[in-house]
Amino acid sequence: MNGVLCSSSSSFHSYPSIFTKFQSSPIWSFSISVTPLCSRRAKRMAHSIARDTLGLTHTNQSDAPKISFAAKEIDLVEWKGDILTVGATEKDLARDGNSKFQNPLLQKLDSKLSGLLSEASSEEDFSGKAGQSTILRLPGLGSKRIALVGLGSPTSSTAAYRCLGEAAAAAAKSAQASNIAIALASTDGLSAELKLSSASAITTGAVLGTFEDNRFKSESKKPTLKSLDILGLGTGPEIEKKIKYAADVCAGVILGRELVNAPANVLTPAVLAEEAKKIASTYSDVFSANILDVEQCKELKMGSYLRVAAASANPAHFIHLCYKPSSGEIKKKIALVGKGLTFDSGGYNIKTGPGCSIELMKFDMGGAAAVLGAAKALGQIKPAGVEVHFIVAACENMISGTGMRPGDIITASNGKTIEVNNTDAEGRLTLSVGISCNQGVEKIVDLATLTGACVVALGPSIAGIFTPSDDLAKEVVAASEVSGEKLWRLPMEDSYWDSMKSGVADMVNTGGRPGGAITAALFLKQFVNEKVQWMHIDLAGPVWSDKKKNATGFGVSTLVEWVLKNSTN
C-alpha cells in the first residue's frame, strides 16, 4: 500500500472545471475572482455530466465578483465611499449622563453628525450586542451611509471579527454598494499581532459574506462590492500578507462549499477526481496527482472501499494529491484523509423516516471537500518544509443487485476482516483504506461526516475530535482557535470496543447507538500504525447550515492553519 503514497506522476485531461476559479493580483490590492460555471466550457461539462446521469443540469449566467482590499490609516470622518462600517462592543456604546458616547471615535463621528449618530442608534436600540447591526443614512460624512455592527464583549474573538466582515458584506448587498470601509470603534488592548489577526478575520468574513453559490439558480443578482478598505489596524507588508493569506484560504473554503452544494447528479466520483486533478495542474510547481480506477484499486486489495462502491453505476475513483515544496528540505510528512461519498443512500439499510435527511446526503463528501479545499489554498500559499498527502476514496453508496449486503464479510486493505452489520455505516469502510495507505507519514488527520451520534452530542456547529495523541490534539485545537472553527475533544473509550466484536470476522462495522461516534473512531483506529499520530474529526454537524440551506466549507481553514504549524514558514 505504500506504493500509493508519494506518487509523483499523473496524467491530465482538458476537462473544464464546474467550480469557482480564483485569481489574485499583487498583495497590496488584490482581487478575488469567482468564475461562474456558465462559461461555454462549463456548459459543455454540465452537458457531458447530464448525459451520464440524466440530470440535464445547466448552470446560470453570472458575472464574477471581484473585491480589492487595502489597509489604510486615515481619519474615518474623511473616508469617502458608500458605507463606513464600524464594529463596536457593548463597552464602546457606553453613554455619559447626557446620553453621549464615551468612546472617542464614536464621539468624533457623533460630533461631526451633530449628535445624529447617538440619537439614531438609540432609536434603533443598538447596544453593541453580538449579532446586532443597523445601517443609517446620515448627512455630514464622506460616506453615504454608516453601519454599526455589534461585537459583543470587549474581548472579541476571531468569530466576532469574521461576523463583522460578513455584516459589512450584507450591508453592501442590501444597499448595492460598491466600495465600503470597516473600522473598529476601539483598538485599545489590541497588540500588533491581534490587529493582524483581526484584519485577516474581517477579510475572511467579507469575502465569504459576498460569495453566493448561484450556479443552479435560473436568476441571480450580481454582486456589487468592488473594494473594501480596512481602517485603523495598520499598514505595510505584514498586514498586506495577512489579508492576502485570508483571501487564499477563502478560495479553498469556497471550493469546499461548492463541492458540498453540488448535487449528486452533477458531482459524481469521476467529477470529484477531475476537480482534484485540476488543483494539481493549476499548482503543478508543488502538486502531483494520482487517480486510481477500480481495477487499480482491486490490485491494491482495497476491498472495503470497493464493496461500498459496488452498487453504483458511477465507478469509484481513489484520489491522491501530493504537495511538495519546489525547494528546500522536507522536515515533516503529513496526510489529510477525507470521506468522499458523493451520495449516500444508506444502501440496503436505506435512510428512511423523519430526520434521516436522505435528500442532503450529497454532503456526505464534506470531509473530502475540506481536504481538497485545503489543497487549493495551500497551492496558493505554498508552505515550506512540509510534504502533504491528500487522500479521498470517492464513491457512492447505492442499492442494486451487485451492492453490499448486511451480513457480508469484507477484507480491508490491511488484511483485517469486517462483518457488515449496517450498510449505512459505509464511510468508515472507505476511510480505512485512505488511512491504511498513509503509514509512511508522521501524522494523519481524517475528516468525515461520519455519525449522527456526534451531532446529537455536540449540536450543529461543533465538530468532534478523537485522538490518542495529546500533542496532536493541542496542535489541531490551536489551529482551530486561529480559524474560528469550533472543535471539541471526545474520549476514545477502549472498553466500548467490545460492542464492535464479531463472532465470524475480526470486527463489525458498527456497535449500535450508544457511543456511536466513539465506536466509529475506535473502528478507524484499527487501521492506524501505532507509530503514526492520528486524529479523526467528525464534522457531520457543522458541514451544513440548516439556517442558510447551504454548505459551510467547515474544516478548510483549520487544516490550512495546522499544515502551516507543521511547516517551516
From Swiss-Prot:
Cofactor binding note: Binds 2 Mn(2+) ions per subunit.
Main location: plastid
Organism superkingdom: Eukaryota
Tissue: Expressed constitutively at low levels. Expressed in vegetative and reproductive organs, including leaves, stems, roots, cotyledons (after imbibition), pistils, sepals, petals, stamens, and floral buds (at protein level). Present at very low levels in healthy leaves.
Binding locations of Mn(2+) 2: D344, D424, E426
Any one GO BP annotation for this protein: protein hexamerization
Keywords, comma-separated and alphabetical: Aminopeptidase, Chaperone, Chloroplast, Hydrolase, Manganese, Metal-binding, Plastid, Protease, Stress response, Transit peptide
HAMAP family xrefs: Cytosol_peptidase_M17
Listed name of the protein: Neutral leucine aminopeptidase, chloroplastic
Lineage, uppermost ranks: Eukaryota, Viridiplantae, Streptophyta, Embryophyta, Tracheophyta
Gene (UniProt): LapN
